[in-house]
């Protein structure tokens, strides 16, 4: 997931729908109010601070708003006949950079700080700045000057990226309703502010959720001793199990006690049920109302206009077609799982109810993998200690993309467990950026996996380049005494995926902050990172990523072959679940009056063939709905069509560690950032139109 943390260019990872894009940008000629605080925008430096107190966050938020508004006012007061590219558009773009960097220091701590008061202050800063973003994005005086510039400027005399910036600025102004009557603009503005606050609160509720359950050792049947030993023991000799991933998934995949899994699944899918259900009931109609005022039939139509899919009809056709193609495979997988369940119930004396429950799915899919491919993830993870995986991952990315990474000693970070690396071009030694690795769970920390863009890699007013900075935030299991953090293979895949976003952020070299890094279409943003997941299914790459944590021995070749062969296990059900989530997202954003829990339950039954547990409301836990993927969750599957096409037609064909192909990928897919349309970048790389053949093969299906 890409957490879109640039206020001016983002939407999240991230938390994105909670961010309102900074649509209009700020300016050069009125830089004087900002000079005193702009030293950190010097080229080639990471100027981010993570030690701000709650009071400093509040004070700096108000200062940033005052300084930025002064710039807007200056641009807005330009006589319309005196507007030029330099004093209007370029000026706005220059000041935008300063705003982004300062805003990052104010609103990112809500996701990673160990101090609850800092997180609260950061959340409030995010709300305050999001309201301000909306105010500034709806300045009709700025919009009028940009429209005038487009009408009078000699577009042939400005660079293509600047021309794109101008066109996007006008487009965003219209999508904000600045061409509409003032009373309509005010109505839109008011609703947008409320939507922003609701999105921030939705994700804050999930981040701050500290629900836990207590089980006896007997109730944790079949879970490995190392997992049990890592748990906090309660006074009554029972164990504390949280709903964080490092606890939840091991229980759901390996615990043989159905009642334990039922309780966990019920708790997991009722997190923040009351408060987030209320938020969705307010948020979805507001989105629909804004879309209607702007002239769109639905919110989904509004957001899809800017994506590669373009229309809800194309998305619906894609999802329905894929669902039908996967239906026979899903049925076969369900039948096999039911046979496993029936056999186990008979052997262990459990009641057999003749159906697959939501709390059965992960458990029996894990058994399927073990039986069909002799893959035991608990055994395999002993070969994936996090230090070995990290070293192997960094080496593969360096070799593939022509880069070098150096860990920064005594780095300024937000937690002692966080590390910082500098990225250089291997051939020239040019510093391209830096990235943080934040790998372990903490109280109040963002509880999924995402890449946060923190500092844009773009040009500064003096023509020098700002250092691009990103943070990879995940939640792998903590090391315990005598045993390092060990990753399941699916966690290794997640690591590769999110680091792919990091490389996109670092390797992009754009003129404007708005186009930096991962600021591409939402249904294209996953393409680069998904493509790089293929490396964790390659035997040679897996050898570089693994070593037994005790004796350093490699994984046996026959086990590696089985692991790679297991790629297609459960692919029908896993993909159908993605279709369920995509359909729910589309439904809620085409008919806002629908009940989210009921809609999810309907699609679970109709498409997945596994009923949602009564009393749960999974959409209330679905951060993407309030995190920049609203109406766009289909993008994960849509992007895979492109990512698989790139991998099989180029890397698989010419060698996955072929440095020439790697540089072609870096230059044609990563380097442009959002300065080109995603489909144009893809066609430049493929030298043809993309097709679904490789994607269908990756799902165990035959291309037509």
UniProtKB/Swiss-Prot annotation:
Q: What is its main location?
A: mitochondrion
Relay the cofactor remark from the entry: Binds 1 zinc ion per subunit.
Q: Tell me, which GO biological process terms does this entry list?
A: peptide metabolic process; proteolysis
* Modified residue annotations for N6-acetyllysine: 664
As listed in the record, the transit peptide stretches over 1-37
Q: Which top EC class is given? A: hydrolase
Q: Where in the cell is it found?
A: Mitochondrion intermembrane space; Cytoplasm, Cytosol
Q: Which cofactors are required for activity?
A: Zn(2+)
Q: Which UniProt keywords apply?
A: Acetylation, Cytoplasm, Hydrolase, Metal-binding, Metalloprotease, Mitochondrion, Protease, Transit peptide, Zinc
Question: InterPro entries attached here?
Answer: MetalloPept_cat_dom_sf, Neurolysin/TOP_dom2, Neurolysin/TOP_N, Pept_M3A_M3B, Pept_M3A_M3B_dom
The UniProt entry's GO CC annotations, sorted and at most eight, read: cytosol; mitochondrial intermembrane space
Active-site positions on this chain: 498
Binding positions (Zn(2+)): 497, 501, 504
Q: Which stretches are annotated as coiled coil?
A: none
GO terms of molecular function: metal ion binding; metalloendopeptidase activity
Q: Which reaction does it catalyse?
A: Preferential cleavage in neurotensin: 10-Pro-|-Tyr-11
Record-listed E.C. numbers: 3.4.24.16
**PANTHER family xref list:** NEUROLYSIN, MITOCHONDRIAL, PROTEASE M3 THIMET OLIGOPEPTIDASE-RELATED
Name the job this protein performs.
Hydrolyzes oligopeptides such as neurotensin, bradykinin and dynorphin A. Acts as a regulator of cannabinoid signaling pathway by mediating degradation of hemopressin, an antagonist peptide of the cannabinoid receptor CNR1.
Query: What family does the Swiss-Prot or TrEMBL record give for this protein?
Result: Belongs to the peptidase M3 family.
This protein's name = Neurolysin, mitochondrial
What's the name of its gene?
Answer: NLN
